[in-house]
Amino acid sequence: MPSSMSVRLFTASAAQRKKIQEGDCCVVLAGKTQGRFILIGAVARVSGYIPSYLDKDELCVVCGDKATGYHYRCITCEGCKGFFRRTIQKNLHPSYSCKYEGKCVIDKVTRNQCQECRFKKCKTVGMATDLVLDDSKRLAKRKLIEENREKRRKDEIQKSIVQRPEPTQEEWELIQVVTEAHVATNAQGSHWKQKRKFLPEDIGQAPIVNAPEGGKVDLEAFSQFTKIITPAITRVVDFAKKLPMFCELPCEDQIILLKGCCMEIMSLRAAVRYDPESETLTLNGEMAVTRGQLKNGGLGVVSDAIFDLGVSLSSFSLDDTEVALLQAVLLMSSDRPGLSSVERIEKCQEGFLLAFEHYINYRKHNIAHFWPKLLMKVTDLRMIGACHASRFLHMKVECPTELFPPLFLEVFED
């Protein structure tokens, strides 16, 4: 084997092996074993990215190898670019010396044999030392690049937000009707924190009646909750009756929709009044309860779902209109069993959803993917409604019927 040749092992990717096997590299193959190639001579070359401003076969002005771009004011290969950068950054050139009086010919074969002549040629062809950044400048440049990249990303997000449609005049009118219906039927309004009363700590801590699934029912807490359940249900009914599209439906469908959504809307109204400081929910705008009190007072595992929803929604900063539109979407659910006007109800819900989405665009929340995340809360509320229906059946077995308010039974009994 000629002394000028070298033998090395080269681990290649599938794409690189294909290139080698097809003779697309300047190598001589002596053999291969398990994807590792014994290369005699030059190392396998795999075509990399070449900028569009370079000719296909443009050569490095320093060594004559294939050029990869415009580096430090000259068209060079990656090898000469890296050599020049390292030399300047580490101040290596004072230690370079030539054995042949600085007269070496630099090409892609000899470029690694004499560092002094290679560096000398780099400067001769015009490579600029002042363009090589030291560590601090390089970090500053990298930071600037990252900042510009982040700015472009934010600009793209902002541009996409700006381009999203906002409510039409007709949708604004619908939004106003729904919002006014909610505000008129939402107990205590925005003053609920000032007007709420905390359920005494000793209530809801003494389970008396065993409930299924390991739950307990504190009858005193249950009695307190029954005092506010009737007005809470009444407010949900009043909300629905203030929507013209609901009132135009057959009475039978109105009843089915109300029975289906009542717990969901009451849960939503409680969840948006979650207070992180006291870790309580305020029911019907007046009674603040802890997770344990709500659980022991009859709701069992359903209370966990409502509290978890409250914790999640606290970061959304929903306004009255968004809460109102969520309620309208829950009310007009066309998949409730027994409905006769399915297509009509579905069309109403689609109208609410479209106006809702456009209102979200108008509000311009700073939460990524706000709209789909908010829609997931509709699914969570539907699950709460389904869990409560199951829980109600167990409660009817465990608790005396006279403890349940008549309207409560009317709404939640099948």
UniProtKB/Swiss-Prot annotation:
| Record's protein name | Thyroid hormone receptor beta-B
Task performed by this protein = High affinity receptor for triiodothyronine (T3).
The record's GO CC annotations read:
nucleus; RNA polymerase II transcription regulator complex
Please list the GO terms describing molecular function. Answer: nuclear receptor activity; RNA polymerase II cis-regulatory region sequence-specific DNA binding; zinc ion binding
* Compartment(s) of residence: Nucleus
Where does the protein principally reside?
Answer: nucleus
Keywords tagged on the record: DNA-binding, Metal-binding, Nucleus, Receptor, Transcription, Transcription regulation, Zinc, Zinc-finger
- Signal sequence segment: none
Under the heading SMART domains, the entry gives:
HOLI, ZnF_C4
Biological process according to GO: cell differentiation; negative regulation of transcription by RNA polymerase II; positive regulation of transcription by RNA polymerase II; retinoic acid receptor signaling pathway; thyroid hormone receptor signaling pathway
Tell me which residue ranges form NR C4-type zinc fingers: 60-80, 98-122
Q: Which Gene3D superfamilies match?
A: Erythroid Transcription Factor GATA-1, subunit A, Retinoid X Receptor
Provide the species name.
Xenopus laevis (African clawed frog)
Give residue ranges for domain NR LBD: 170-414
What induces this one?
By thyroid hormone.
Could you tell me which Pfam families the record lists for this protein?
Answer: Hormone_recep, zf-C4
Record-stated family: Belongs to the nuclear hormone receptor family. NR1 subfamily.
Q: Which InterPro entries match?
A: NHR-like_dom_sf (IPR035500), Nucl_hrmn_rcpt_lig-bd (IPR000536), Nuclear_hormone_rcpt_NR1 (IPR050234), Nuclear_hrmn_rcpt (IPR001723), ThyrH_rcpt (IPR001728), Znf_hrmn_rcpt (IPR001628), Znf_NHR/GATA (IPR013088)
Q: Which residues bind DNA?
A: 60-134
Upper classification of the source organism reads: Eukaryota, Metazoa, Chordata, Craniata, Vertebrata
